[in-house]
Amino acid sequence: MQLYTSAANIPHPDKSHRGGEDGFFLTTPSISSVGIADGVGGWANQNINPKLFADDLMEYTKQSIESGVREPVIALDEAYNMVEQTGSCTAVVGIMERDGLFSVANIGDSGFIVIRQHEILIKSKEQQHGFNFPYQLGKVEGKDGKFYEHGDDRPQDCETYQLKLHEGDIVVFGSDGLFDNIWDNALLEEINSMDCESPEKMANSLAEMAFNEAGRKDNWIPFTERALEQGAWGLKERNDPAFLGGKMDDITVVVAIVV
């Protein structure tokens, strides 16, 4: 079996001049791997392009996998050691073997969902130090020109998953711009309504759906629900009119179909 994949990316309108802050990679079906990284936007306040760290981490992860590494945490660790950029990002990386064994490493608030026979089989969990403070991999440049680990999180802190995929399973990977704006049941309904074998159409449809929800002013989204659950912003009531509206962000979606 192999993963037949396609990606869609819609940058935050205010960040489109630099292509947003997400990075991602796809490999050929014979290698069957996927990765998404979400650059932490706060670095822009220090005149650092957050996308560069995310892009490099994904490129080096792809290179590691293409060289023969088949464990996502090891691939991420090799890539992290190679990055020479100041910045940080969340990341999710998945690899499937020919027998369907699917391994994923996730750090932070990007993630994935597996859909089987029109139902959600599994969804990854976020890793947060606190509300809207996801685990992240980072580095900073020292005065000596070398790059050093930044923050407390490392590839070994990834949440890991392993399961057997079946032919026809659909895996949706996304940055938080997808999962913060789209409820799981709405995502599932959108995928099921398409009933097609085109990951490109599915990825584009989900990205556009998330972007539309992000721009609305009258919706209650998963991100705000988590704020309510965690007591953030002084929020005490669901659908409080003062807190309605989407969360504009970079949106990256990868859809993989098992064939």
Language-model-detected regions and their locations in the chain:
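PP2C/PPM-type serine/threonine phosphatase catalytic domain
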Residues: 1-259
